[in-house]
Amino acid sequence: MWQNNYKAYGAPRLRLALADLNLHHGINRIRRLMRSAGIYSVMSRRFNKPTTTVDYSQRPNLIKHLPAANAWSMDITYLKLNNGQWVYLASVLELRTYQILSHQISTTMDTRLVLITLQRALSTHQKPSYLHTDMGSQFTSFGFENLLNHHKIDHSYSKLGHPYDNARIESFHSLLKREMIYQFRFPSIAHLILDVAKYIHWFNNERISIANRKMKVA
């Protein structure tokens, strides 16, 4: 069970997963068994990544005081292949449900990457009232702003230098790296594309969310 879920589950989620199989154990017992078996939830590690600069004035955060707003969040993160090559993952997340609506991987971090990713989400889901992003050049480009205007979606922006304004999708990308990327090797972008798609399907449909289960875990 631990192995089949990307080694991502610590004692609280393992307790919930076992309960789904009608196997009920106290969390302290599960922790003891995990220690004796050398099982632990995977931990994150850091790597140095390329940096980008922004030459734009601050634009408004429209959803800061609207936590229940009908909004999507979008971001780009860096991933690395075995040969050291950087590739780029763009993702669209629905803030209400914490579901990934679309994603795209590319060898170039350009406007085309974010346009394709957003267009995929719009083709399969009802458009949001707001889209929240950082102020990277891809998201402030004429083409991207024009697409939002065409669909009458208001663009909300994180404050410059404050990535946690986009915390939910930052959190998803962090989980992706900790629970999957750092555990495997990717000899090609094709391997990475396949494994990221599998992880996102698991994340959307199978990964246990303690907050949503309303079950006492301590």
Predicted regions and their residues:
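Basic, flexible linker segments flanking DNA-binding modules
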Residues: 1-69, 162, 217
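Conserved, non-catalytic sequence blocks in retroelement Pol enzymes and Pol-derived host proteins
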Residues: 4-7, 20-23, 65-66, 81-83, ...
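Mobile genetic element proteins and their domesticated derivatives, centered on retroelements
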Residues: 14, 30, 34, 63, ...
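RNase H-like polynucleotidyl transferase catalytic core
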Residues: 43-48, 131-135, 150-168, 184-187
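An active-site-proximal beta-strand-loop segment
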Residues: 68-101, 107-108
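Active-site beta-loop-alpha junctions of metal-dependent nucleic acid enzymes
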Residues: 85, 103-125
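Acidic/histidine-rich, metal-coordinating catalytic segments
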Residues: 118, 126-141, 213-216
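C-terminal domain-tail junction helix/linker
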Residues: 149-153, 175-218
